[in-house]
Amino acid sequence: MPAPQMAAYPAVRLEPQARTAQDRSRIYSHRFRDAKPINFGRASPRKLAVHGVDVSRWQGDIDWPKLRTQGANFAYIKATDGGDHLDPMFRKNWREAKEAGIKRGAYHFFYWCRVASEQADWFIRNVPKDPDALPPVIDVEWNGDSACRRRPSPQQVREKMQVFMDRLERHYGKRPVIYTAPDFYEDNLKGAFNDYPFWLRAVAQHPSKVYPGRPWLFWQYSGSGLSQGVSNKIDLNVFHGSEAEWHRWLDRVGS
């Protein structure tokens, strides 16, 4: 929604709390650039209203207020890997993103050689139970750089995911979002978890082409975004809906 018009009342000074509350609902338009732009044609993510980012330690020290004005209306922040690794920038990013008025959530990179319940406990230990946060995310993909070379069967994958997601949903009271990439989805997730929201990576084609028949909540459309407020490249994402639908979804999930 548009920012409140204050020019007509130059003598009035809003209290910081009121100004912050008003500003938090504002949607900033997309001003990101892309080092490797893709022409999505009529299915361009730019036609959608609510854009955001996902970040980790690789983005370094982020100027969150500046990033927000570039169009980061939401951010998913890397929190944990496996059962014993915490992203060193998580706590700082978690705090400063909220201070900047950005709707933010945390994500966990799942390790296939670790027990699912241990990973859930590690995430819960490190990610605050903030009622304003977006639903937590489980990031499931194949990692060629991992020391864990054994790939579980599709059934084992889904069983591990279910244990992890059930534990998080009980703790945070919000159904987790599943983030995935095309190869992992094809191997393990086609037709599964139809009652969970999906966040889909599709950087060359629209998700409807890469994941036919799969409804999606978020689309990661670029891994080469450029923005003021961040020195390195950044992942760009968009919410599947209008600005009004975004606010309704936030109300529904309690964020």
Where in the sequence are the language-model features?
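Substrate-binding cleft of extracellular glycoside hydrolase catalytic domains
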Residues: 37, 45-65, 78-162, 169-171
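A local structural micro-motif
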Residues: 75, 105, 176-177
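Sec/Tat-exported extracytoplasmic proteins
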Residues: 71, 79, 98-101, 127-131, ...
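Conserved acidic residues
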Residues: 73, 134, 216
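Catalytic domains of cell-wall/extracellular-matrix polysaccharide-remodeling enzymes
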Residues: 135-212
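Flexible, glycine-rich phosphate/dinucleotide-binding loops
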Residues: 84, 113, 185, 207, ...
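Functionally critical loop-and-helix segments that line ligand-binding/catalytic clefts
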Residues: 2-52, 193-255
